[in-house]
Every structure is written in C-alpha cells, then in structure tokens.
C-alpha cells in the first residue's frame, strides 16, 4: 500500500482510527511516512505530533496502546484508516474516544433504540 504523502506540504496524511470491533471512530491523528511504516511494522498506532514535532506511539505514557488490526487507504491514497483494538481510553482526557463518545460493543444499538422510542 502506498500513501501519497507528497500531496501535503508538511507531508502529513490524516489517519482516522476506528475500533476494529465496534466500528466507532476513536480519533484523528496525522502520519508522516516514518510513522506509517512504524505502525505497519510494529502493529501499534504511531503518529506524528504536530505540537511536539516528533513521532509518538499512542499509549507510550498511558499504556493505552492501539493494536492495529488493519490499515486501509482511501480511493485517492491520501488518507489512512486504521482499524485498531484500543487498550483503555483513547483520548488523553480519559474518554473512550477523542469525540467524547462511549465505545462499547453491542450496547450502543440498544441505547439508540431506547432513545428513539422514548
């Protein structure tokens, strides 16, 4: 798989992380070619921190790693989808996702049905 990092002036492609089991979007990060290759070789989500200007592996300080199940490129090969198995909270603020959503298998359908009926 080839990602078109050259499309972006900073050579950082958006990387959407999705829970491999629930399908819930967990976070958005950015990858340069080095982060992409490290993620592929180690099967752990590694990104490029725009604020720290360095690679960081999700969970390197918290222990909440993202084990990679699959990596896909979009139709233009300029965006990355990572299907992962999270170990604990994904957001640095302590929530399941960086979008403030709960990430649980199965129960979400029942919760949606309940809110629709109520």
Predicted regions and their residues:
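C-terminal binding/interaction regions
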Residues: 2-14, 20-21, 25-26, 31-118
């Amino acid at each position: 798989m080839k990602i078109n990092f050259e499309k972006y002036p900073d050579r950082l492609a958006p990387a959407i992380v999705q829970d491999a089991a629930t399908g819930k979007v967990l976070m958005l990060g950015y990858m340069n070619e080095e982060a992409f290759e490290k993620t592929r070789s180690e099967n752990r989500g590694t990104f490029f921190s725009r604020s720290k200007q360095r690679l960081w592996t999700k969970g390197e300080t918290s222990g909440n790693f993202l084990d990679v199940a699959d990596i896909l490129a979009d139709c233009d090969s300029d965006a990355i989808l990572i299907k992962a198995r999270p170990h604990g909270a994904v957001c640095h603020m302590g929530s399941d996702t960086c979008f403030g959503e709960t990430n649980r298998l199965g129960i979400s359908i029942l919760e949606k049905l309940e809110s629709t009926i109520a």
